[in-house]
Amino acid sequence: MKYLDRIADRMLQLRLEAFGAVQIVGPKWCGKTTTAMQQSKSVIKMQDPDKREGYLATARTKPSLLLKGETPRLIDEWQVAPVLWDAVRNTVDERNQKGQFILTGSTVVEDKNGEIMHTGTGRISKMPMYPMSLYESKESTGSISLRLLFDDPAYDIDGFLSDMTVEKLIFAACRGGWPASLDVTSQEAQLLIAQDYVNVICDEDISRVDGVRRQPALARLIMRSYARNICTLVKKSKMLADITVEMEKTSMPTFDDYVSALQRLFVIEDVEAWCPAIRSAAAIRSGAKRCFVDPSIAVAALGMSPRNLELDLRTFGFIFECMCIRDLKVYSQALGGRVSYYHDRYDLEADIV
């Protein structure tokens, strides 16, 4: 499959110019490694089954040996050996050069064994990455510039129209922004990527993320409850009540533990409230808007199809908002922005700020 340009490409280039190392974080299958490989000069894949044990033995003995190679050197799934973090930081200090390493991984590392001694501040820049936006998947024309909307008061967007029909938007939301889905011919097969993603998260990754055994059935229930309440301000207690209908003994600490694991896997990424008054506590009193990192996760968790959503446009409205949030996170990142929502006590609201 031909590499499709990502907005993250330019962001990675700039960070490599400014820092000794860059850590790309984000959900699995969103294209982190492929994007990193476009700019790396050498690669080491820590999860290579033929070399993994040898790499781990080297990491335990002398981790700096794994860092030898042409730079920028990509260390894929570095969290397999957390000690590499300090090794990278130390090597960056010693070399005193920019653009030495790229680290990629699909989980937030929980350093229970104290293998990471330093934060990496000033040496290792963290760069979030998301599934593909509609512009990156070549489904949006990109005719409206987000940058110009901010920079040019005279910028006129009247008359700009999308050539995507409602049916195409629904399918794009169900398929998601997973690069692997674009390398598949049939639409039916494209939809399997997101479905398999949810299965892998629930059956394997939610326990593997920190070595704590968790129930796949409960993980599915929590993801389904999140999906039912996607892009709403529903309280955790309401979702827990929804879950206990089918699994009575689920407690709030257990619910929080599962959600935390899904957040560390970059599956759940709630949207925080925005408050225009910097010193005001209004934003703190506002709850988080429930959201997945990609709309296809919600669709797959609910077991819905494009046809189901065509017959239920109200539900699709929430799924569509999730897709808009994903795309705006991708676009606004390049401008140094972030995505929030606004909802005040007078019920004045803006879905996305």
Q: Where do the protein language model's features map onto the residues?
A:
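N-terminal pre-Walker A segment at the start of P-loop NTPase domains
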Residues: 1-16
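Hydrophobic anchor at the beta1->P-loop junction of P-loop NTPases
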Residues: 24
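Short glycine-rich substrate-engagement loop in P-loop NTPases that contacts/grips substrate
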Residues: 43-72
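Interdomain motor-coupling "hinge/lid" segment immediately C-terminal to the ATP-binding subdomain
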Residues: 114-228, 232
